[in-house]
């Protein structure tokens, strides 16, 4: 006859783990002291001086070298572009800093700053373009051509 082996397995419950040893539960006193210990706050306003200098350098480059603006309005000399760029950035920074937004990270203020820089850069090159080439006199130029079309359509 075949012999059969009998195995006996005995199981026992592990000892109870105390609440302080339980790794899945944080102690309530610690949670109350610091509810979110890994909160990271990133603010993009105000920009660092290094960032502001980079903005000024980019403005100088845009105003003094060939760009979309220079093709349409002409470019500025390096020294003039430098002083214009500094004043554009300073004014835009002052306006944006005075603007009050409810966001915590400064994104809306940064948008206002960027918008002011763009607006002032365009105003500067347009003003320079108008000084460099005064508006055409009667009889030559776009204004007189438009005026003559209006006059002929009224007749």
Curated annotation (Swiss-Prot):
Biased composition (Low complexity): 7-39
Gene3D superfamilies to which the protein is assigned, alphabetical: WPP domain
InterPro entries assigned to the protein according to its UniProt record, in alphabetical order: WPP1/2/3, WPP_dom, WPP_sf
One BP annotation, GO: lateral root development
Tissue specificity annotation: Expressed in roots, stems and leaves.
GO cellular component: Golgi apparatus; nuclear matrix; nuclear outer membrane; plastid
Biased composition (Basic and acidic residues): 146-155
Residue span of region WPP: 28-131
Cellular location(s): Nucleus envelope; Cytoplasm; Nucleus; Golgi apparatus
Domain of life: Eukaryota
Entry keywords, A to Z: Cytoplasm, Golgi apparatus, Nucleus
Region (Disordered): 1-41, 124-155
Subunit structure, as described in the record: Binds to FPP proteins. Interacts with WAP, WIP1, WIP2 and WIP3 through its WPP domain. Interacts with HSP70-1, HSP70-3 and WIT1. Component of a ternary complex composed of WPP1, HSP70-1 and WIT1.
Function: Regulates the mitotic activity in roots. Plays a role with HSP70-1 in facilitating WIT1 nuclear envelope targeting.
Domains: entry comment: The WPP domain is required for the nuclear envelope localization.
Protein name: WPP domain-containing protein 1
Organism name: Arabidopsis thaliana (Mouse-ear cress)
Phylogenetic lineage: Eukaryota, Viridiplantae, Streptophyta, Embryophyta, Tracheophyta
Name of the gene this protein is made from: WPP1
């Amino acid at each position: 006859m075949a012999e059969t082996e009998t195995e006996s397995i005995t199981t026992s419950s592990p000892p109870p783990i105390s609440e302080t040893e339980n790794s899945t539960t944080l102690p309530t006193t610690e949670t109350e002291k610091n509810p979110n210990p890994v909160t990271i706050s990133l603010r993009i306003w105000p920009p660092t001086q290094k960032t502001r200098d980079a903005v000024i350098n980019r403005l100088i480059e845009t105003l003094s070298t060939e760009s979309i603006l220079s093709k349409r309005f002409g470019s500025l000399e390096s020294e003039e572009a430098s002083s214009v760029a500094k004043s554009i950035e300073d004014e835009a920074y002052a306006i944006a800093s005075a603007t009050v937004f409810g966001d915590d990270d400064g994104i809306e203020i940064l948008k206002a700053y960027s918008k002011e820089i763009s607006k002032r850069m365009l105003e500067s090159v347009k003003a320079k373009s108008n000084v460099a080439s005064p508006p055409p006199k009667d009889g030559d130029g776009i204004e007189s051509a438009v005026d003559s079309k209006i006059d002929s359509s009224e007749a």
